[in-house]
Amino acid sequence: MADTSSRTDVSTDGDTDHRDLGSDRGHMHAAASDSSDRSKDKLDQKTLRRLAQNREAARKSRLRKKAYVQQLENSRLKLTQLEQELQRARQQGVFISSSGDQAHSTGGNGALAFDAEHSRWLEEKNRQMNELRSALNAHAGDTELRIIVDGVMAHYEELFRIKSNAAKNDVFHLLSGMWKTPAERCFLWLGGFRSSELLKLLANQLEPMTERQVMGINSLQQTSQQAEDALSQGMESLQQSLADTLSSGTLGSSSSDNVASYMGQMAMAMGQLGTLEGFIRQADNLRLQTLQQMLRVLTTRQSARALLAIHDYSSRLRALSSLWLARPRE
């Protein structure tokens, strides 16, 4: 009986232990389920935020891509235009005028129109210079000389107006000097003569001058030299900037990214080249202002002699070019 009671007690204790263990397991399962639900809620919220961020990033990416495609299209159009102009220039080439003393670029209608206008301008200038020379040789009075001198200066203003219009159409034609003779091109600076160099050449042609006139011409020469140096430095900076633009990026690759980069470089380079027109205009303004200020320092008769000296110097350069082109060749 004692053994039976003992077994019964053990069995009862075992059942109680199993019930307690089952209850604990139930609580643990419920807790785990609650924790899993909370984790799932947090995960869902993170996923929703991530999806929202992804959608926003995708929207911004589409906008950037649209803007980039538009930029590429604009660059492609500009590049196509450049290629067409280059092809026309190659087809038309370069020809020598019938006089044999001047090479002309035929890179477009703008260049041809300028060459024709400059030729007419030169003919009128020759006529004016002959008139001025005759007046000086005939010892004409200051009033008559002043009328002719003013006409010559107005004619120079017309030249710079013609050049300004030509620069808008083909600035490279002006910079290359193909509208000048070969000898003149040796001394070309930003599409024309250096004012400071002309003043040096005129120093011996205008004697005798008063001390005040000498000081005025020297001061004008220094001022012109400083302005020329500033423009030359600006051109050097432009050339360096252009070289940096064209050399940036990966070379030799034909991937779509590099093609797009190439087109972007060309568009940027075209924008930089647009400043060349400004350099030509500033250089011509300096030339005109130097001539005007020079005439203010000189007397009327000295002004007439100075304009003749400039004309004769240019004429000799053109004559030298003709002789050079006509020289015997072995």
Swiss-Prot record:
Composition-biased stretches (Basic and acidic residues): 15-27, 35-45
Record region (Disordered): 1-45
Pfam families: bZIP_1 (PF00170), DOG1 (PF14144)
PROSITE patterns: BZIP, BZIP_BASIC, DOG1
bZIP domain mapped to chain residues: 44-107
GO-annotated molecular function: DNA-binding transcription factor activity; hydrolase activity; metal ion binding; transcription cis-regulatory region binding
Subcellular location(s) of the protein: Nucleus
GO biological process: DNA-templated transcription
Biased composition (Polar residues): 1-13
Keywords: Activator, Coiled coil, DNA-binding, Nucleus, Transcription, Transcription regulation
Segment forming the signal sequence: none
Region Basic motif, residue ranges: 46-66
Main subcellular location: nucleus
Cellular component, GO, one term: nucleus
Reported tissue expression: Expressed predominantly in roots and flowers.
Superkingdom of the organism of origin: Eukaryota
Coiled coil regions in record: 45-142, 217-233
Region annotation Leucine-zipper: where it falls in the sequence: 72-86
Function: Transcriptional activator that binds specifically to the DNA sequence 5'-TGACG-3'. Recognizes ocs elements like the as-1 motif of the cauliflower mosaic virus 35S promoter. Binding to the as-1-like cis elements mediate auxin- and salicylic acid-inducible transcription. May be involved in the induction of the systemic acquired resistance (SAR) via its interaction with NPR1. Could also bind to the Hex-motif (5'-TGACGTGG-3') another cis-acting element found in plant histone promoters.
Assembly notes: Binds DNA as a dimer. Interacts with NPR1, NPR3 and NPR4. Interacts with GRXC9/GRX480.
Family that this chain belongs to: Belongs to the bZIP family.
Protein known as: Transcription factor TGA6
Gene of this entry: TGA6
